[in-house]
Amino acid sequence: AGGNGGWLWGNGGNGGSGAPGQAGGAGGAAGLIGNGGAGGAGGQGLPFEAGANGGAGGAGGWLFGNGGAGGNGGIGGAGTNLAIGGHGGNGGNAGLIGAGGTGGAGGTGGGEPSAGASGGNGGNGGNGGLLIGNSGDGGAAGNGAGISQNGPASGFGGNGGHAGTTGLIGNGGNGGAGGAGGDVSADFGGVGFGGQGGNGGAGGLLYGNGGAGGNGGAAGSPGSVTAFGGNGGSGGSGGNGGNALIGNAGAGGSAGAGGNGASAGTAGGSGGDGGKGGNGGSVGLIGNGGNGGNGGNGGAGSLFNGAPGFGGPGGSGGASLLGPPGLAGTNGADG
């Protein structure tokens, strides 16, 4: 772990990166004035083991300073579909004045040729200063691993991290994007679904804009197969936009598209459904309501009776007391 900064002044040290199978070190905290250290990256997973998690970012100074960024999660190891990607570390919190740290990204899933592991989740953003400061963005999620041989399924995409909270004055951070589901390039095997986008942070209690929700991850698709037409996976939902009191609310994230069904000699695969768009944030007093995110498109059905996937619904627009409401997101098209 990184060392702490001086009691009066000084930045916290950065955490070290983890060796294979070991978590990243946490960032050191600052004292009265200074920035928190960044968390170290998690190591790649050993064979048959998950990727290690990223270290958390250190806290910013009690009076002034930004929180450190969270470390990224490690890639999952080989040999099993339980070898998920490591989760990203959370961003450090600010003290009285300062911005929260960004959450670390999730690691890509590991696995084996016939069974893919899911991606790791993104870390949550750190909280902004109690008085003034923006909250940190959520980290992006890791993608699920694909498979190249016949087996159970490919990996699911991880979920994006949520933005941190703000204090009195500040803008909410954006939610992290969901990871994509793994593809299948074999005769049969289930495909991974897309992960959900993280929620945007709310604006400050007195003033500030809400953050946007993260986009949902796209679903995996089966490849060109001959024995059995695999179904496309469902797209991930978009995150919700952050609310605001005085300021503009955040927009909802767009959803991921459903995967296409694969063609086959006897029975074609069905397309996956698109995810739901995130809802726009609402405004309590003055400002624009957030627009809803768009729904994901449905995947196409294959030849030989493969059914198309349904498009996902768009998110609703946010309301505003003394301002225009947000627009609803468009519905995704059917496959």
Predicted regions and their residues:
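Long, compositionally biased tandem-repeat segments
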Residues: 1-335
